[in-house]
Amino acid sequence: MRKADLVVGVQWGDEGKGKIVDMLGLNYDMICRSQGGHNAGHTIWVDGVRYALHLVPSGILHKNIINIIGNGVVVSPEVLITEMAQFDNLEGRLYISDKAHLNLSYHSQVDQAKERLKGEKAIGTTGKGIGPTYADKISRSGHRVGELLEPERLCDALMHDFETNKPVFDALGVKIPEENELLEELKRYKEVLAPFIANTTNLVWKALDEDKKVLLEGAQGTLLDIDHGTYPYVTSSNTISAGACTGLGLNPKEIGKVIGVIKAYTTRVGHGPFPTEDKGTNGDKMCEIGKEFGTTTGRRRRCGWFDAVSVKYASRLDGVDTYALMKLDVLDGFEVVKICKAYQYNGETIDYVPTDLENATPIYEELAGWDSVKGISRYEDLPANARAYIERIEELTGVKVGYISTSPERSDTIIR
């Protein structure tokens, strides 16, 4: 039986997973999304055209690939329908798990209200209602995509939920829809989405049993994992490679090659510890050149130097076999580039990620910069200093770099 390969982000998300999945997708029969919701965003450039995807897997740009939204994803029908409208002839190419949980408008209202109440202690969520949706799932009070096939029954269940939660909703200022409006909305969702709702676990199993090539597409990044990330400044799902198993119904033996996606520098959206953040001109330069604004929220990403300590930690959690190094071109023209090789922590030098990362100070190694890597298609033709930078990352993390992106375009990728 063939195993499924996995692409996973190894930093705080926004590493460039979409480009890698889109590039590798031509070699696969099926591409699967396993967790997260429309708080995640993949940006793909093809022939100068920008595609921003939030729920639909990146393989949708390839006509012969089956795309799966797995049970671990939380699905906003409204967002999904809007996103699907960008593409033609999706039947037979896109399937949504009937076990995936529904993210509805009241979830985002709850999310935003709670963030406002936290004031300065706000986590900095996207406000898309992802956390409240997963909270409903864990408390066994959520609703699943398969329930859209019976809109009247789902409407009754939701109205009962609204009544039960009315004191909380009133306190938070959540607007509860009228029953007739809700029913019409659910009927519309059914009309559009019914042909795509399926038992996706069986579809993935069948593909593997038939020796089809399957690629799993992670969302966000390992350092945002609900258990192993910088809690509480994390997302609400398991973003590590093991999350792909629970989010699709696979066992660990069915995971093959793990490709860890890393950016040549580091970015983070929202609040939370970020040891290598550069709040000066270098960070501003990375943001400007790298166009570091969120695909989902448009928020400016915090930027800083490459952190080999956190990447090594995340790579161990994910079982990374090889790296895809993205946005190397953004560092073009820097006279000096830095890599964090250790932390100063409570008076000691450490080479691991402590639970309270906010108390860690980076210890940097400085390397000489380079002029430009744009348009280079062979590793040997990269500037010597760029190669030295890549090879030092490999030495510090213990993982080889197999792919190097030198521009947003699909074609500008070096394969070693």
Curated annotation (Swiss-Prot):
The active site is at residues 14, 42. It comes from the Bacteria. Its cofactor is Mg(2+). Mg(2+) binds at residues 14, 41. It catalyses: IMP + L-aspartate + GTP = N(6)-(1,2-dicarboxyethyl)-AMP + GDP + phosphate + 2 H(+). GTP binds at residues 13-19, 41-43, 301, 327-329, 405-407. Pfam families: Adenylsucc_synt. CDD domains: AdSS. Pathway: Purine metabolism; AMP biosynthesis via de novo pathway; AMP from IMP: step 1/2. One of its GO terms (cellular component) is cytoplasm. Substrate binds at residues 295-301. It is an enzyme of class 6 (ligase). Its EC number is 6.3.4.4. Plays an important role in the de novo pathway of purine nucleotide biosynthesis. Catalyzes the first committed step in the biosynthesis of AMP from IMP. PANTHER family: ADENYLOSUCCINATE SYNTHETASE. Homodimer. This is Adenylosuccinate synthetase. It comes from Campylobacter concisus (strain 13826). The gene is purA.
